[in-house]
């Protein structure tokens, strides 16, 4: 097996941080190109207007700016990517991606675009009912990825 390109998925949790460290070490061992992806999921804002109780018509907006919210998310994404590279890959050339949309689908799309040979992802910390209702990002990636997926647990750390 030859691994020429490793794609590392990074979110804001400890599981993903540990997986990133593991992924960069794997890339070093194989002398592989490395990609780092962070997915920005769109935030759906609830209706932010107040309604006049007598006439039932909207009276004013609460002023939440979706563009500003997207800028904040973009900034957070850039920060986590930069911090991860500084911490684990300062000596490496890393191609980084910020994708928008569903986390699992974004990782898979990025893997295809990067021509990754393997995806490295952390286990997700969801458990119980939350996992049942929401699903698992790593599970979705494993089931739908066109390339092998290495799921790195936090246990044993």
Regions found by a protein language model. Name each.
Residues 2-63:
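Small/aliphatic-rich secondary-structure junction motif
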Residues 37, 95-99, 150:
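General small-molecule cofactor/ligand-binding pocket signal
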Residues 108-157:
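Gly/Ser-rich helix-loop-strand patches that form or flank binding pockets
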């Amino acid at each position: 097996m030859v691994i020429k390109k490793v794609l590392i998925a990074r979110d804001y949790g400890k599981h993903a941080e540990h997986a990133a460290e593991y992924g960069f070490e794997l890339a070093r061992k194989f002398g592989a190109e490395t990609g780092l992806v962070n997915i920005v999921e769109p935030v759906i804002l609830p209706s932010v207007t107040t309604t006049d109780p007598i006439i039932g018509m909207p009276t004013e907006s609460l002023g939440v700016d979706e563009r500003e919210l997207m800028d904040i998310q973009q900034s957070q994404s850039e920060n986590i990517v930069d911090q991860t590279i500084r911490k684990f890959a300062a000596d490496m050339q890393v191609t980084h991606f910020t994708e928008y949309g569903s986390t699992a689908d974004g990782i898979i799309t990025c893997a295809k675009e990067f021509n990754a040979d393997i995806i490295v992802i952390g286990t997700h910390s969801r458990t119980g009912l939350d996992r049942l209702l929401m699903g698992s990002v790593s599970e979705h990636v494993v089931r739908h990825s066109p390339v092998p997926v290495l799921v790195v647990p936090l246990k044993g750390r």
